[in-house]
Design a protein with these regions (language model features):
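Residue-level detector of alpha-helix initiation sites
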Residues: 76, 138, 176-177
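Alpha-helical segments flanking ligand/cofactor-binding loops in enzyme cores
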Residues: 24, 48, 62, 83, ...
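Glycine-rich phosphate/diphosphate-binding loop of Rossmann-like nucleotide-binding domains
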Residues: 6-44, 154-191
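Hydrophobic beta-strand scaffold residues
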Residues: 33, 57, 114-115
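Short glycine-/small-residue-rich Rossmann-like dinucleotide-binding loops
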Residues: 69, 75-76, 95-96
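Glycine/serine-rich phosphate-binding loop and adjoining beta1-alpha1 elements at the start
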Residues: 2, 8, 79-169
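Short acidic low-complexity segments
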Residues: 54-67
Length: 191
């Protein structure tokens, strides 16, 4: 079974659907993994790391998609790209199915089974595939770091010979995954 990881071409996208450590596990399980050259570059993973993990590297995106039994990517494919997928293939990515009806219809017409990552329920059973919670967790952390860099003061309480600086007060709106991580990060930074 051939699993394909195409490079993301959306401007500003730095994520990759599969990292080299996961490639090792999939290859050990008997899958053949092909990665488009440069797919992991913006996430800090060189092609050589994928090769060391057991993946093949290709520069031919069309052949990669045509031959794949499973396609893993972060962003949705273009409607035009769906015709490159073979009938019976499985496509896994964020799809935005409520707003991308034409794309969902095209995938269905092409006989491609689609898994929309944002529709996977947040349950214990599906936890290993819950990409939204992972992304929200990172977002909560990053937002506090970015907010701290914009403050005209420091977050933790500091006692110096010149006086004491009281800790910053942080107000987080929301208590979902991102909000809870933001609260935890702000507390760890001393707010």
């Amino acid at each position: 079974m051939l699993l394909a990881v195409p490079a993301e071409h959306t401007e500003g996208e730095r994520r990759v659907a599969l990292i080299p450590d996961a490639v090792k596990k999939l290859v050990r399980a008997g899958l053949t993994v092909q990665v488009e050259s440069g797919a992991g570059k913006h996430a800090g993973f060189a092609d050589s790391l994928y090769e060391e993990a057991g993946a093949g590297i290709t520069t031919d995106r069309g052949s990669l998609l045509k031959g794949a039994d499973i396609v893993l990517r972060v962003r949705k494919p273009s409607v035009d790209e769906v015709s490159s997928l073979k009938q019976g293939a499985i496509h896994v990515s964020y799809l935005d199915p409520y707003n991308e009806g034409a794309l969902v219809d095209k995938l269905t017409e092409a006989g491609v089974t689609s898994i929309s990552m944002e529709m996977i329920p947040r349950t214990t059973r599906a936890q290993k595939m819950d990409a939204l919670s992972s992304q929200a967790n990172l977002a909560g952390y990053v937002m506090v770091i970015q907010a701290a860099s914009k403050l005209d003061r420091i977050l933790p309480m500091m006692m110096t010979p010149a006086g004491t600086l009281s800790p910053a007060k942080v107000f987080v709106i929301g208590a979902g995954v991102a909000g809870l991580q933001a609260i935890a990060t702000a507390k760890r930074l001393g707010a």
